[in-house]
Amino acid sequence: MAVNLYDYANQLEQALRDSDEYKAIKDAFSKVKDNEESKKLFDEFRETQLSFQQKQMQGEEIPEEDLAKAQEQAQAIEKDENISELMQAEQKMSQVFQEINQIIVKPLDEIYAD
C-alpha cells in the first residue's frame, strides 16, 4: 500500500489548528485587532518589515532614517501588552514548527549521516 504523504500533511494541518499554540496565536491576534492602538502599531510595523524585506531582496540599502523609525516602532510594540502576547505566542508556534521540521527531515538526515 502506497503512503500518501499529502494525507498526513493535511492531518498535520488539522492537528496544528487544534493545538494550544495555534489557539493562543488566534486569541492574541484577536486582542490586537480589537484594540485600535495595538492594531495601528501592528499594521505599521508589518508594513515596515515588508518594506525592508523588499529592499533587501532587491539589493537596496535601508536608509538610516528608516532604521530609526523601525527602532521606534519596535520599542512601541514591546510596550504594547496585546502585541507582546501575540509575539510570545508566535515564538512558541515557531518552536513547534522547528521541532516538526526536525522530525520531517530525520529520514534524510539519517541517509546522509553515514
Swiss-Prot record:
UniProt-listed InterPro entries: Com_YlbF (IPR010368), YheA/YmcA-like_dom_sf (IPR023378)
Pfam families according to UniProt: Com_YlbF
Highest taxon in the source lineage: Bacteria
Family, as annotated: Belongs to the UPF0342 family.
HAMAP family in alphabetical order: UPF0342 (MF_01526)
Name used for this protein in its record: UPF0342 protein SH1117
Species name: Staphylococcus haemolyticus (strain JCSC1435)
